[in-house]
């Protein structure tokens, strides 16, 4: 049963005359937990595993960054798993609506690991003394020309042995496979109660602001930057998550 705390996403359920670009505004922030669960295959698994990966890679007296934190799901997962002393999580999002709700979510749970929630462009954040950096479905919303520079800054700010966790929607060079995975994703959304109108209108709204890369493109960037190990650790249809270890 859906609670009042997690209202149903009906943002695209009625016909919209002029569909504008998708933005992470108050309307989206309000329904985001329902939207993300019903739209992103494997989202709960990714969030849970981010906590487990953080537990394995976090170092005492280091910083953990959640860049594009939205409502703080990855931050909460990591905070539950961190046992090391002197750590701090820095959660960043450029949406004021997301940041305010993120603070409320985090304040509902007690933890020994402090979290600083910052409203800012992740490209403007200094990365330093980091043992874990998370980009959970965030990089795909940056301008393509800005992606390498951000990853370069993350690499420079990671401690040796530190990990970058990158979750993204993927595109595929094999057109038949690419179209099949898109169709399966739409089947997933239909199975979760989205109508054809909702799927079509959401796709129109988001196609100009979310520009996914291929797995090969991500791996080429990691190799160029100098990461010692990188791989896809989770994939469901055209969504997945990768790690890159410095």
Swiss-Prot record:
Ligand binding (S-adenosyl-L-methionine): 43, 68-70, 93-94, 121-122, 136, 203
**Gene3D superfamilies from the entry?**
Vaccinia Virus protein VP39
Q: Name one Pfam family in it.
A: Methyltransf_25
EC number of the protein? 2.1.3.-
Keyword set for this entry?
A: S-adenosyl-L-methionine, Transferase
Presence of keyword S-adenosyl-L-methionine: yes
Q: Which reaction does it catalyse?
A: prephenate + S-adenosyl-L-methionine = carboxy-S-adenosyl-L-methionine + 3-phenylpyruvate + H2O
SUPFAM superfamilies from the entry? S-adenosyl-L-methionine-dependent methyltransferases
Kindly give the InterPro entries that the UniProt entry links to this protein.
Answer: CmoA, Methyltransf_25, SAM-dependent_MTases_sf
Family classification: Belongs to the class I-like SAM-binding methyltransferase superfamily. Cx-SAM synthase family.
The record describes its quaternary structure and partners as:
Homodimer.
NCBIfam families from the entry? carboxy-S-adenosyl-L-methionine synthase CmoA, PRK15451.1
Q: What is the protein name stated in its UniProt record?
A: Carboxy-S-adenosyl-L-methionine synthase
């Amino acid at each position: 049963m859906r609670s009042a705390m997690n209202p149903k996403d009906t943002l695209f359920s009625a016909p919209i005359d002029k569909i504008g670009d998708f933005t992470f505004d108050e309307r989206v922030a309000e329904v985001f937990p329902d939207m993300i669960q019903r739209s992103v295959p494997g989202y709960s698994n990714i969030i849970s595993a981010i906590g487990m990966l953080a537990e394995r890679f976090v170092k005492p007296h280091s910083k953990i960054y959640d860049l594009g934190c939205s409502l703080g799901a990855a931050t909460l997962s990591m905070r539950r798993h961190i046992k090391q002393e002197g750590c701090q999580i820095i959660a960043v999002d450029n949406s004021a609506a997301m940041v305010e709700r993120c603070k409320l979510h985090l304040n509902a749970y007690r933890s020994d690991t402090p979290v600083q929630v910052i409203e800012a462009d992740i490209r403007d954040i200094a990365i330093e003394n980091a043992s874990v950096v998370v980009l959970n479905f965030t990089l795909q919303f940056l301008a393509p020309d800005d992606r390498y520079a951000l990853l370069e800054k993350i690499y420079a700010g990671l401690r040796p042995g530190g990990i970058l966790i990158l979750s993204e929607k993927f595109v595929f060079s094999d057109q038949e496979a690419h179209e099949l995975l898109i169709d399966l994703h739409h089947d997933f959304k239909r199975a979760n109660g989205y109508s054809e109108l909702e799927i079509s209108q959401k796709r129109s709204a988001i196609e100009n602001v979310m520009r996914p890369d291929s797995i090969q493109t991500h791996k080429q960037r990691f190799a160029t930057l100098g990461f010692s190990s990188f791989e896809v650790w989770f994939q469901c249809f055209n969504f997945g998550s990768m790690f890159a270890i410095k």
